[in-house]
Structures are given as C-alpha cells and as structure tokens.
C-alpha cells in the first residue's frame, strides 16, 4: 500500500504566545503539512495546549506530538487530551507516542526511569487502552500497568477510528512493534548511528 509523504516541522524552544502563533502560520504558509512538538519537562510549551493554539491560528496545518512521553501522564488522560486536540483542530491531529528516553524527564518528575523493556511494554499497553477509549464506549481494562473501570473516552476524535498514530523510538523491538501498529514511525539518524555510521568529526 502506498502512502503520501508529508513534510513537517518539529518545533522546540518557542516560549512566547505571539511567536508561537506566527511560527504555526509561517509553517503553513511555507507548505509544510504538519507542526510537531515534543513532550519534555525542560523549558518548552506543553504540547497539547500549544497545538490547540497552533490549530486555531491556521486552517489546513496538521498538528501533532513527536511524541507524548507515555510515562508523564496516565493513558486515560492522554486519550482525552489527544481526542480534544483532534476535535478542536477539526480533525487535524496526529497522535504521537513514545516510551520515554530522557532521564531528566523522569528525574524532574520524580518518576522511576525503568529499564527500556518495561517502558516499551507500558507504552504498548497504553496505546491499546487509548485505542479502546477513542471508540467512545465504556472501557474495562486490567493490565500489567493500567486499570480502568467503566470510563468512556470522551470526547470522541473527529478522525475515525482515531488520529493517525505516530510511534517514536530507536530500539529494534519497539520499531518492529511500531511497524505493525503505527501509521507513522518516527526515527532519527542520530538514534541509529551504529546502523548508518558515526557522525563526522
């Protein structure tokens, strides 16, 4: 199956409201398809409210997370935030998720930085739970990491069954899983330096 290639801009250090809106408008004007924000505890905008503002300042630009750090929020809350972003953007959201990789995010939040295998298993379970919540029906979930009793995913996203799922990561096991479940897989050359060769001096 062929899919169109989309080009996007990943923003990081904008902290001014007017500058953020202008950046979103500029990205759209230049013809990029998507504006993406990461999810870290360092000085940067919180992704979901910032992306709602970017969507409000534009008309066609897609907005998404690259990626939500799964361990920084419960998947029930994350599903509500992503669905709200999709609703308020008129169906222009991309749903980006990652297992978490930056120790500073965990240290600053007081969250244990578990081994990669544990974080990946938790991400897989969170994505499964969020998919169920996007359906809008009451969800009963008893998993290794999460429990949910009778909560309904509201609001429902505009895009059905859910916004395009972007999984970010570098670990081979995670990328194999991402290739089987995600609409978009985000990898960076710096994460794969052993496969493509070292950086130049």
Can you say where each PLM-predicted feature lies in the sequence?
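Active-site-adjacent structural elements that line small-molecule/cofactor binding pockets in enzymes
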Residues: 1-201
